[in-house]
Amino acid sequence: MEEAGQDPLDDVRDVMEIPKLEITKQNLDSLNSDLEKDLQRMDEANQVLLKKIQEKEETIQSLERDITLSVRQAREREELDHRTAEKEAALRDLELETAKLEKNKEILSRSVVEVQKEISRKFKNVSLDKEALKQMLAELKVKLQKSTESCASQEKELVKIESDYQSVYQLCEDQAHYIKKYQEILRQMEKEKEMLLLEKEVQRWRSSIQSAKTRPGADCGSDHELLIAKFRLKLKKVGKTTRPFRCKAQNNATQIVKPGSTLVETIQSNMEKTIVKKQKRIFWYRHFRYFIFVVMIFFRLLGYVLFYLQYINPDLLVDALPMVMSRETLTRLRDALFPFLTLEVEEVLPH
């Protein structure tokens, strides 16, 4: 009788649960259809992103080529800068030489005038030989010709150096233009890196969605909602990272750090480091030189003292120690140096 009373109740419960199960089944079917639609949309978006990736890879290759070319050009510019520095030093030397030659020319002109005056005086006072005067004039003319030729050659060299300076100035302007291009390339590279990170995240979430789709139908809806929520949060985080980096100052102000300006900062820091290293080397070289000089002087004085004690006044220590030290200190010194003393020196010290 008890079994007969329980069977109708179980049937009623089963009948009540059937519509609930149908409702859950309908919900699951709708969720699965939504998932399929989302996956189709993701596939289309991924195809578009793949096309963009291919285009960006091509642009990256072209940018790498441009970077290699810019590096080569930078090396060539460094060599040109070195050459220009050498030429500038040569220019300075030439300017100094030209100044000296001009002074010599003035001195020669003055001396020629003085010689002419002296010749005129001597010609008035004493009848000089015409041949001697002709020789003097010929020598002076030869000297003047040599000085004029040297001045002309120096002027030609100055013209050449000025043309080289103009070419170097143009190269420096080109170098600044290429540096600006390099900064723009770096900015584009950073943007492309950010896009690649976004694409990787999309592929990762796509694989996670596919793995969630293969699970049993009972937990599919909750997993789908969790994945969508996580994906939205991740997109928000990545969107924040794509914005320009902002650094908070002490006065709570924001300073935008541009990625292209890092190149100039690195160049300046490298130049400062090299200058500091050179200064340190010069500092240690000078002190090492002073140290060697002091050591040489010390050994020289020590040699003089030993020579004096050996050949001039060997009894200096014997006469000076009793005057400087007391008897107790002399006995202590004798005890300390006893193993190293000979019989002659031992007899000199007090007992």
UniProtKB/Swiss-Prot annotation:
It holds the Pfam family TMCO5. The keyword Cell cycle does not apply. It comes from the Eukaryota. Residues 17-214 form a coiled coil. One of its GO terms (cellular component) is membrane. It is found in: Membrane. It is a single-pass membrane protein. InterPro entries: SMCO2/5. The chain crosses the membrane at residues 292-312. Keywords: Coiled coil, Membrane, Transmembrane, Transmembrane helix. Its main location: membrane. Belongs to the TMCO5 family. This is Transmembrane and coiled-coil domain-containing protein 5B. The lineage of its organism: Eukaryota, Metazoa, Chordata, Craniata, Vertebrata. The gene is TMCO5B.
